Amino acid sequence: MSSQVNTTRDSRRKILQGIVVSDKMQKTIVVQVERKSKHRLYKKLVITHKKYHAHDEKEECKIGDFVEIMETRPLSATKRWRLNKIIQKAK
């Protein structure tokens, strides 16, 4: 499965895609987003990961799901993203 990142602006809100790595909190998921960039000097492809806490109102995500999250107003100390849609369910 390709975990390609698409960062676009839809009505000035960022949209990211990633894999759910934790769903242990109530109405909260942790999504790991992968970014690929070239090193400036060595021109090697560098892969970096970042984890985002996202709001899952219906608690429908499970670990391993490929999801799309959208930027939103601050919901807690760490949550500034919400689940937009589930692209692919985990097997």
UniProtKB/Swiss-Prot annotation:
What SUPFAM superfamilies is this protein classified in? Answer: Nucleic acid-binding proteins
- One GO term of the biological process aspect: translation
Keywords, A to Z, come to: Ribonucleoprotein, Ribosomal protein, RNA-binding, rRNA-binding
Gene Ontology cellular component? cytosolic small ribosomal subunit
Q: Which domain of life is it from?
A: Bacteria
Q: Which GO terms describe its molecular function?
A: rRNA binding; structural constituent of ribosome
Record's InterPro entries? NA-bd_OB-fold, Ribosomal_uS17, Ribosomal_uS17_bact/chlr, Ribosomal_uS17_CS
Q: Does the keyword Metal-binding apply?
A: no
What HAMAP family does this protein's entry cite?
Answer: Ribosomal_uS17_B
Q: What's the stated role of this polypeptide?
A: One of the primary rRNA binding proteins, it binds specifically to the 5'-end of 16S ribosomal RNA.
Subunit relationships: Part of the 30S ribosomal subunit.
Which family does the UniProt entry place this protein in?
A: Belongs to the universal ribosomal protein uS17 family.
Name of this protein:
Small ribosomal subunit protein uS17
Organism of origin is Malacoplasma penetrans (strain HF-2)
